[in-house]
């Protein structure tokens, strides 16, 4: 079959392209911006890429067009597909029909921690000999791709609540038929497509409805939003994680890089790993619980996590200059910002200075939905630097006014980087947070710090 993918360079659609190629299909694709690393990865697999959406790319006519969720009516390729009656479907629908239908699917859903937890579950199964397939929204550190078919019935997927395509506005995860479902947490997010929390809970309940009776749902025992969702009806086994749940994690040191795994009060494993933070400990416990449903002993799962490497942009060390370390994180919601700062604070100790540098870039952030929660979420930073995005209906100065520590802001990335470099002292830690590239600020900071160090000599 010849498959053409519209919007191929996103992590999810690029992953589907690799799966389709592994199944023996001829695969081509296009995107508005064809760029590395995804373009390099796809071309290595023998997938031809086209820049832009000129309708001529659909000649000769493909057997199937997979339509990415960024495609809209008016796109020349979309219009040609509809006009010529070319068979088409969404990425999640294709994934269900051609990959997931006959697999034991382990799905990881929730507002935060999906990529990390899915990566952990995948690595546990891989390290324990299960050879799983996977599709993850980032490249897990233990692998060099974001998707593969695998060589067993087991398949791990990051189950995203974003919509499927212009013709299917349901959440992607309703297509994923999980037998093991992790529900990490649930908050209001994606304000560009959801009106309120209830709208998101409705989609999550669609997911809960399709877990079989012999399947298992793993969730935190203290998440009221998830409890409300399951109260709408649940027909599967549940395992609760947390203080009053079946599973607990017990920290053995301040930064949570060592912790015990407890099941019904009994110690069943111990994790010593390179990650820090209670949020990662929570993610790891979820992955261990899911792996047990598949058949992995908790002790073996805990040992496997000892060699887990997280995806990029999860408290990733980008470099050091002038005695200052620069970290990068994908955090783009107040809860994630709070957790990431707490993790870094646990790692560096209570007296080291942390400079938090934030770009409010997600659609929810830009709309100002959670702006009132930003100042409290930044509380563990000693100094805060905010980028003012253009064309948004609020000012980051409002957040600055609500912060208790010194805050600086600018609408220019270069100016903001200079402010951070000027404030940074040897021994400080800079944490950059954004779900985008932030104008290359990480390298600007490292270059500026190196110049500052040279000038001081």
Question: Language-model features: where?
Answer:
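Phosphate-binding loop of NTP-binding sites
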Residues: 19-23, 43, 57-60, 69, ...
């Amino acid at each position: 079959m010849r498959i053409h993918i519209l919007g191929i360079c996103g992590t999810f659609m690029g992953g589907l392209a690799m799966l389709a190629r592994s199944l023996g299909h001829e695969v081509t694709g296009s995107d508005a911006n064809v760029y590395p690393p995804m373009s390099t990865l796809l071309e290595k697999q023998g997938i031809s890429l086209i820049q832009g959406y000129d309708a001529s790319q659909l000649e000769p006519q493909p057997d199937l067009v997979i339509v990415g969720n960024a495609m809209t009516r008016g796109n020349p390729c979309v219009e040609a597909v509809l006009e010529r009656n070319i068979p088409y479907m969404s990425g999640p629908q294709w994934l269900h029909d051609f990959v997931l239908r006959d697999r034991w699917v382990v799905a990881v859903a929730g507002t935060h921690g999906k990529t990390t937890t899915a990566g952990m579950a995948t690595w546990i199964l891989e390290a324990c000999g299960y050879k799983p397939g996977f599709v993850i929204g980032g490249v897990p550190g233990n692998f060099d791709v974001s998707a593969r078919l695998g060589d067993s019935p087991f398949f791990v997927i990051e189950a995203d609540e974003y919509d499927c395509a212009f013709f299917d506005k349901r959440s992607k995860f309703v297509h994923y038929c999980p037998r093991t479902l992790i529900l990490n947490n649930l908050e209001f997010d994606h304000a560009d497509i959801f009106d309120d929390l209830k709208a998101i809970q409705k989609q999550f309940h669609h997911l809960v409805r399709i877990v079989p009776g012999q399947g298992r749902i793993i969730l935190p025992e203290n998440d009221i939003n998830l409890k409300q969702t399951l109260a709408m009806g649940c027909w599967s086994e549940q395992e609760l994680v947390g203080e009053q749940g079946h599973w607990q994690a017990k920290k053995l040191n301040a930064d949570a890089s060592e912790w015990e795994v407890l099941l019904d009060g009994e110690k069943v494993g111990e994790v010593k790993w390179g990650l820090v933070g209670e949020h990662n400990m929570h993610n790891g416990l979820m992955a261990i619980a899911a792996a047990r449903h598949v058949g992995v002993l908790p002790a073996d799962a805990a040992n496997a996590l000892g060699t887990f490497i997280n995806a990029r942009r999860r408290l990733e060390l980008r470099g050091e200059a002038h005695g200052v370390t620069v970290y990068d994180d994908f955090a783009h919601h107040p809860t994630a910002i709070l957790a990431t700062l707490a993790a870094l604070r646990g790692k560096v100790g209570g007296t080291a200075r942390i400079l938090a540098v934030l770009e409010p870039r997600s659609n929810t952030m830009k709309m100002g939905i959670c702006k009132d929660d930003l100042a409290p979420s930044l509380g563990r930073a000693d100094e805060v630097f905010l980028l003012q995005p253009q064309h948004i209906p609020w000012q980051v100065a409002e957040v600055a006014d609500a912060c208790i520590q010194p805050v600086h802001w600018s609408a220019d990335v270069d100016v903001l980087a200079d402010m951070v470099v000027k404030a940074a002292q040897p021994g400080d830690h800079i944490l950059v947070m954004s779900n985008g590239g932030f104008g290359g600020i990480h390298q600007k900071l490292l270059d500026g710090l190196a110049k500052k160090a040279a000038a001081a000599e």
